[in-house]
């Protein structure tokens, strides 16, 4: 699971971007006016992966790219709001995070409606949430953007430089649980399945792998009961 890379931007539009890192090309989603440019070389890109179930029951993944960790955490926080998906979250992020949070905290509907890309439906969902007061917003989103040390273009990107194995595994589990809940699985089902799975299994490399294993385990338990 890649959380950040140093990359060369090859192509960027208002919603999509192609970048190259370690001779691999990545086609990712970006917010409007993302701040990325084709002139960017060896720029740090923060990534968030979303896993979803396609119509043919295949598990698909999409990558979302951000200029800072603060942006990435803001995106993840917006996705916790009922009714807000990745496209809407990206559109909300065109506006300054602090301004959006202040308007939500003040219950200012008219103020939200004056912002770009926020209609009455989205504004109502924002106001109905408790996003402005959640603990993780204070501790994760409102952080200073620090300058990261530059590395050579040909240096191999390895997530283990920043996260140890247990931290990576914890993030994989959290993302897998979020995905399964969004697919309609109950927390008790997920918890029971997790207790029966060897999380150190080499076949589990990312959240998509874990989602597939948990779904299979839930299916086995269901067939045993029936």
UniProtKB/Swiss-Prot annotation:
Q: What InterPro entries does the record tag this protein with?
A: RuvA, RuvA_2-like, RuvA_C
Which GO-annotated molecular functions does the record name? Answer: ATP binding; four-way junction DNA binding; four-way junction helicase activity
Residues covered by region (Domain III): 168-226
Identify the stretch(es) annotated as Domain II: 68-145
Recorded superkingdom? Bacteria
The alphabetized list of GO BP terms reads:
DNA recombination; DNA repair
Respond yes or no to whether keyword Acetylation is given for this record: no
Sorted alphabetically, which keywords does the UniProt record give? Answer: Cytoplasm, DNA damage, DNA recombination, DNA repair, DNA-binding
Compartments where located: Cytoplasm
Q: Map out region (Domain I) in residue numbers.
A: 1-67
Q: Does the keyword DNA repair apply?
A: yes
Q: Which residues form the signal peptide?
A: none
Flexible linker, as annotated region: 146-167
One GO cellular component, as annotated = Holliday junction resolvase complex
Give the matching NCBIfam families. Answer: ruvA
Its subunit composition reads: Homotetramer. Forms an RuvA(8)-RuvB(12)-Holliday junction (HJ) complex. HJ DNA is sandwiched between 2 RuvA tetramers; dsDNA enters through RuvA and exits via RuvB. An RuvB hexamer assembles on each DNA strand where it exits the tetramer. Each RuvB hexamer is contacted by two RuvA subunits (via domain III) on 2 adjacent RuvB subunits; this complex drives branch migration. In the full resolvosome a probable DNA-RuvA(4)-RuvB(12)-RuvC(2) complex forms which resolves the HJ.
Q: What does this protein do?
A: The RuvA-RuvB-RuvC complex processes Holliday junction (HJ) DNA during genetic recombination and DNA repair, while the RuvA-RuvB complex plays an important role in the rescue of blocked DNA replication forks via replication fork reversal (RFR). RuvA specifically binds to HJ cruciform DNA, conferring on it an open structure. The RuvB hexamer acts as an ATP-dependent pump, pulling dsDNA into and through the RuvAB complex. HJ branch migration allows RuvC to scan DNA until it finds its consensus sequence, where it cleaves and resolves the cruciform DNA.
The text of the family note is: Belongs to the RuvA family.
Q: What is this protein called?
A: Holliday junction branch migration complex subunit RuvA
Q: Which gene encodes it?
A: ruvA
